[in-house]
């Protein structure tokens, strides 16, 4: 059964899931760049964004990105990227045995994080 949107969108999702490290490198109206490090057991849970796309760029480790509409599983290694369109549900996992570090470029538009249930 596909994930369904939760009713409450938030503008700061940092308290909703654990990461090893999170650093904001750039934030301007309608655009931001964040570096995130996940341990092998951590995930960024199913969610979507109303207005912004997420472009993932892997720096270290291996990422597994799951998306819906249509359903896909994308494997990314260092130097590879993938863009998720606004409104497309997605989940990020560490596919390796060591920490994985990636950049996420979010924009252009007003940021929100819509958890899925």
Report each predicted region and the residues it spans:
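Short acidic-glycine-tyrosine-enriched beta hairpin
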Residues: 70-86
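A short beta-loop-beta micro-motif enriched in histidine and acidic residues
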Residues: 25-32, 42-57, 69-70
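Short, conserved beta-strand element in jelly-roll/cupin
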Residues: 37-39, 50-65, 105-107
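Short beta-strand His + acidic residue motifs that chelate non-heme Fe in jelly-roll/DSBH
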Residues: 46, 65-66, 84, 90-97
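A short, N-terminal "cap"/entry segment at the start of jelly-roll beta-barrel domains
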Residues: 1-34, 45-46, 114-117
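A short hydrophobic beta-strand segment most commonly corresponding to one strand
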Residues: 98-113
